Amino acid sequence: MATNKEVVLTYEGLQKLEQELENLKTVKRREVAERIKQALSFGDISENSEYDEAKNEQAYIEGRIFQLENMLKNAKVIDEEDIQTDVVSIGSKVKVLDMEFDEEVEYYIVGSTEADPSQYKISNESPVGKALIGGKIGDIVEVTVPDGVIKFKILEIRK
Protein backbone atom coordinates (compact mmCIF):
# COMPACT_ATOMS: atom_id res chain seq x y z
CA MET A 1 0.00 0.00 0.00
CA ALA A 2 1.97 2.97 -1.28
CA THR A 3 1.32 6.42 -0.01
CA ASN A 4 2.37 9.73 -1.46
CA LYS A 5 2.51 11.51 1.90
CA GLU A 6 5.46 13.86 2.00
CA VAL A 7 8.13 12.70 4.45
CA VAL A 8 10.04 15.59 5.99
CA LEU A 9 13.65 14.71 6.80
CA THR A 10 16.82 16.41 7.87
CA TYR A 11 19.92 15.53 5.85
CA GLU A 12 21.07 13.37 8.79
CA GLY A 13 17.73 11.54 8.77
CA LEU A 14 17.95 10.97 5.02
CA GLN A 15 21.40 9.42 5.39
CA LYS A 16 20.21 7.16 8.20
CA LEU A 17 17.28 5.84 6.12
CA GLU A 18 19.51 5.31 3.07
CA GLN A 19 22.01 3.35 5.18
CA GLU A 20 19.26 1.19 6.67
CA LEU A 21 17.88 0.48 3.18
CA GLU A 22 21.32 -0.43 1.85
CA ASN A 23 21.94 -2.76 4.80
CA LEU A 24 18.58 -4.48 4.35
CA LYS A 25 19.12 -4.97 0.61
CA THR A 26 22.72 -6.15 0.73
CA VAL A 27 23.30 -7.80 4.12
CA LYS A 28 19.98 -8.77 5.69
CA ARG A 29 18.42 -10.15 2.49
CA ARG A 30 21.45 -12.38 1.96
CA GLU A 31 21.47 -13.54 5.59
CA VAL A 32 17.80 -14.48 5.62
CA ALA A 33 18.07 -16.23 2.23
CA GLU A 34 20.90 -18.33 3.65
CA ARG A 35 18.81 -19.18 6.72
CA ILE A 36 15.90 -20.24 4.50
CA LYS A 37 18.22 -22.38 2.40
CA GLN A 38 19.65 -23.99 5.53
CA ALA A 39 16.17 -24.60 7.00
CA LEU A 40 15.05 -26.23 3.73
CA SER A 41 17.97 -28.63 3.97
CA PHE A 42 16.36 -30.08 7.12
CA GLY A 43 13.66 -31.61 4.95
CA ASP A 44 9.95 -31.43 5.77
CA ILE A 45 8.96 -27.76 6.11
CA SER A 46 5.51 -28.47 7.57
CA GLU A 47 6.95 -28.57 11.11
CA ASN A 48 10.14 -26.62 10.55
CA SER A 49 10.23 -23.68 12.98
CA GLU A 50 13.57 -22.42 11.58
CA TYR A 51 11.98 -22.17 8.13
CA ASP A 52 8.87 -20.40 9.48
CA GLU A 53 10.99 -17.96 11.47
CA ALA A 54 13.23 -17.18 8.49
CA LYS A 55 10.23 -16.69 6.17
CA ASN A 56 8.64 -14.33 8.70
CA GLU A 57 11.87 -12.36 8.94
CA GLN A 58 12.09 -12.26 5.15
CA ALA A 59 8.55 -10.84 4.97
CA TYR A 60 9.45 -8.19 7.56
CA ILE A 61 12.63 -7.23 5.66
CA GLU A 62 10.81 -6.96 2.33
CA GLY A 63 8.06 -4.89 3.96
CA ARG A 64 10.59 -2.56 5.54
CA ILE A 65 12.45 -2.20 2.22
CA PHE A 66 9.18 -1.25 0.53
CA GLN A 67 8.40 1.22 3.33
CA LEU A 68 11.86 2.83 3.19
CA GLU A 69 11.82 3.10 -0.61
CA ASN A 70 8.43 4.78 -0.43
CA MET A 71 9.58 7.20 2.27
CA LEU A 72 12.72 8.10 0.32
CA LYS A 73 10.71 8.57 -2.87
CA ASN A 74 8.47 11.06 -1.05
CA ALA A 75 11.22 12.68 1.01
CA LYS A 76 11.45 16.43 1.39
CA VAL A 77 14.90 17.13 2.78
CA ILE A 78 15.25 20.27 4.84
CA ASP A 79 18.21 22.24 3.52
CA GLU A 80 20.31 23.55 6.40
CA GLU A 81 20.62 26.86 4.54
CA ASP A 82 16.83 27.26 4.79
CA ILE A 83 16.77 26.84 8.57
CA GLN A 84 16.29 30.23 10.18
CA THR A 85 17.66 31.23 13.55
CA ASP A 86 14.96 33.82 14.29
CA VAL A 87 11.95 31.48 14.10
CA VAL A 88 11.52 27.82 15.05
CA SER A 89 11.11 25.45 12.10
CA ILE A 90 11.89 21.85 11.23
CA GLY A 91 15.64 21.43 11.59
CA SER A 92 15.91 23.99 14.40
CA LYS A 93 17.67 23.26 17.65
CA VAL A 94 15.67 25.10 20.28
CA LYS A 95 16.73 25.82 23.84
CA VAL A 96 13.70 26.40 26.05
CA LEU A 97 13.04 27.06 29.69
CA ASP A 98 10.45 24.76 31.27
CA MET A 99 8.79 27.44 33.37
CA GLU A 100 7.23 25.00 35.85
CA PHE A 101 10.49 23.32 36.82
CA ASP A 102 12.87 26.19 35.94
CA GLU A 103 14.93 23.80 33.78
CA GLU A 104 16.54 24.43 30.42
CA VAL A 105 16.03 21.79 27.75
CA GLU A 106 17.23 21.70 24.15
CA TYR A 107 15.03 20.09 21.51
CA TYR A 108 15.84 19.28 17.90
CA ILE A 109 12.72 19.70 15.77
CA VAL A 110 12.55 16.94 13.15
CA GLY A 111 9.96 15.23 10.95
CA SER A 112 7.94 12.42 12.52
CA THR A 113 10.08 9.73 10.87
CA GLU A 114 13.19 10.88 12.76
CA ALA A 115 11.60 11.61 16.13
CA ASP A 116 13.40 10.08 19.11
CA PRO A 117 12.36 11.67 22.40
CA SER A 118 15.17 9.90 24.28
CA GLN A 119 17.60 11.96 22.15
CA TYR A 120 15.45 15.12 22.48
CA LYS A 121 14.52 14.86 18.79
CA ILE A 122 10.86 15.80 18.71
CA SER A 123 8.46 15.66 15.82
CA ASN A 124 7.02 18.78 14.29
CA GLU A 125 3.69 16.94 14.67
CA SER A 126 4.05 16.34 18.43
CA PRO A 127 2.28 18.67 20.88
CA VAL A 128 5.57 20.31 21.94
CA GLY A 129 6.81 20.49 18.34
CA LYS A 130 3.56 22.08 17.13
CA ALA A 131 3.70 24.65 19.93
CA LEU A 132 7.33 25.59 19.21
CA ILE A 133 7.06 25.81 15.39
CA GLY A 134 6.81 29.45 14.40
CA GLY A 135 7.96 30.66 17.82
CA LYS A 136 10.64 33.30 18.29
CA ILE A 137 13.22 33.97 20.98
CA GLY A 138 11.46 35.32 24.06
CA ASP A 139 8.08 33.79 23.17
CA ILE A 140 6.26 31.77 25.78
CA VAL A 141 4.41 28.81 24.29
CA GLU A 142 1.84 26.62 25.98
CA VAL A 143 1.48 22.89 25.46
CA THR A 144 -1.67 21.12 26.60
CA VAL A 145 -0.94 17.76 28.20
CA PRO A 146 -3.20 15.35 30.10
CA ASP A 147 -2.12 16.89 33.43
CA GLY A 148 -2.75 20.48 32.34
CA VAL A 149 -0.60 23.02 30.52
CA ILE A 150 3.19 23.23 30.26
CA LYS A 151 4.77 26.60 29.49
CA PHE A 152 8.08 26.95 27.70
CA LYS A 153 10.02 30.15 27.10
CA ILE A 154 12.12 30.05 23.93
CA LEU A 155 15.68 31.04 24.85
CA GLU A 156 17.72 30.20 21.75
CA ILE A 157 17.19 29.01 18.18
CA ARG A 158 20.04 27.64 16.08
CA LYS A 159 20.76 25.38 13.14
From Swiss-Prot:
Coiled-coil boundaries: 3-37
Secretion signal span: none
GO biological process, one term: regulation of DNA-templated transcription elongation
SUPFAM superfamilies listed in its UniProt record: FKBP-like (SSF54534), GreA transcript cleavage protein, N-terminal domain (SSF46557)
Family matches, as Pfam families: GreA_GreB (PF01272), GreA_GreB_N (PF03449)
InterPro entries: GreA/GreB_C_sf, TF_GreA/GreB_CS, Tscrpt_elong_fac_GreA, Tscrpt_elong_fac_GreA/B, Tscrpt_elong_fac_GreA/B_C, Tscrpt_elong_fac_GreA/B_fam, Tscrpt_elong_fac_GreA/B_N, Tscrpt_elong_fac_GreA/B_N_sf
A GO MF label: DNA binding
Keywords: Coiled coil, DNA-binding, Transcription, Transcription regulation
Function of the molecule: Necessary for efficient RNA polymerase transcription elongation past template-encoded arresting sites. The arresting sites in DNA have the property of trapping a certain fraction of elongating RNA polymerases that pass through, resulting in locked ternary complexes. Cleavage of the nascent transcript by cleavage factors such as GreA or GreB allows the resumption of elongation from the new 3'terminus. GreA releases sequences of 2 to 3 nucleotides.
Stored NCBIfam families: greA, PRK00226.1-2, PRK00226.1-4
Entry similarity comment: Belongs to the GreA/GreB family.
PANTHER family: TRANSCRIPTION ELONGATION FACTOR GREA
Record-given protein name: Transcription elongation factor GreA
